[in-house]
Amino acid sequence: MKVQPSVKRICRNCKVIRRKGVVRIICKDPRHKQRQG
């Protein structure tokens, strides 16, 4: 999980979702998991 000030999709499998006001990226590649913080 990377915590970054700006999150971007890395590949086309990445999905941008919002959970409790936090922007997250989920992907089938675990290295692409990110959250905005």
From Swiss-Prot:
Belongs to the bacterial ribosomal protein bL36 family. Keywords: Ribonucleoprotein, Ribosomal protein. InterPro entries: Ribosomal_bL36, Ribosomal_bL36_sp. One of its GO terms (cellular component) is ribosome. It holds the Pfam family Ribosomal_L36. The lineage of its organism: Bacteria, Pseudomonadati, Pseudomonadota, Betaproteobacteria, Rhodocyclales. It comes from the Bacteria. One of its GO terms (molecular function) is structural constituent of ribosome. This is Large ribosomal subunit protein bL36. The keyword Ribosomal protein applies. One of its GO terms (biological process) is translation. Coiled coil: none annotated. The keyword Ribonucleoprotein applies.
